């Protein structure tokens, strides 16, 4: 029986959200860093578009095993312990990115950075959702996840305000700050009360396909894959696409800043609306907004118009992604929650890895920006349908509502 008072529970929740927000902030900065530094990296290492696609995808490839293994280890050894190790890992390899000396070393540094980033996210979600409990879980996860687009906006600010800085600058920031956070997390981050109160064993992956969770697992995987395909294509390729459309690098960084501000706004707005709107309305809002914004990004020619298109793209693309992160913990019990979230994130990372590679291939074939954006439309429609079914069925397929 819990002995925590309401005030102590509230303090624990706020401390957890605050510290996890800071980690999410640095995760967002590092995820955006390669896109912001792309021009400098390509020039410094004389890389073509396909090679840059591999730079982008190496980091995303690392996210996949990181999310899968990080979630499983967290259900066995604790969310806090694995999160701290993850933060140390992506901080160290962000620094390694800044001192890379050739293409292979750069790819390896981005790969290992991705492993750390991937392992961190399911633990951020699990810690926050379990500290909040069922009633405030969606809101708490949305507040925490706001750190990701805000961190990405900070990276864009470095690109916009520091156009004359070395390309390594964003990676120095993305490495030093996480390493400073490590001792703070060790001292102040509470372990999940749900995890601490249970005897843990490594959950088998087949537990995700038990009768009460199989439908949710498959639907989550489907919508994660296609939504993250679009999000990471935008994060990695949009700055270079804008420059090819005739915008200045500083203007491209400004559009990325607008995109991430839209993402932060969408994370809060869509998270708050998740339990208030009908499923069909929510699904139509998110995915029709994504389609419209991609069309605008491929066709708008004015800088002000592109700023607006970037903001709307962030609002619905990353905002929609945050809704998925808030939804996922609802469908799994505490014994398999980090594993369930981690595997969904890992499948999403497959989409995230595919997006930059697909865009690079299409650009190499000469399809241009419009072709890249148009190719994303079928995936958005599939993801929208999966989210609609998932949200419609969640009251029937949610196995439990533990804290």
Swiss-Prot record:
GO terms for biological process: 3-hydroxyphenylpropionic acid transmembrane transport. The keyword Cell membrane applies. Its main location: membrane. The keyword Cell inner membrane applies. GO terms for molecular function: 3-hydroxyphenyl propionate:proton symporter activity. Pfam families: MFS_1 (PF07690). InterPro entries: MFS, MFS_dom, MFS_trans_sf, Sugar_transporter_CS. Induction: Induced by 3HPP. Changing residue 75 to A/E: Lack of 3HPP transport activity. Inhibited by carbonyl cyanide m-chlorophenylhydrazone (CCCP), which dissipates the proton motive force. Uptake of 3-(3-hydroxyphenyl)propionate (3HPP) across the cytoplasmic membrane. Transport is driven by the proton motive force. Does not transport benzoate, 3-hydroxybenzoate or gentisate. PANTHER family: CARBOXYLIC ACID TRANSPORTER PROTEIN HOMOLOG. This is 3-(3-hydroxy-phenyl)propionate transporter. It comes from Escherichia coli (strain K12).
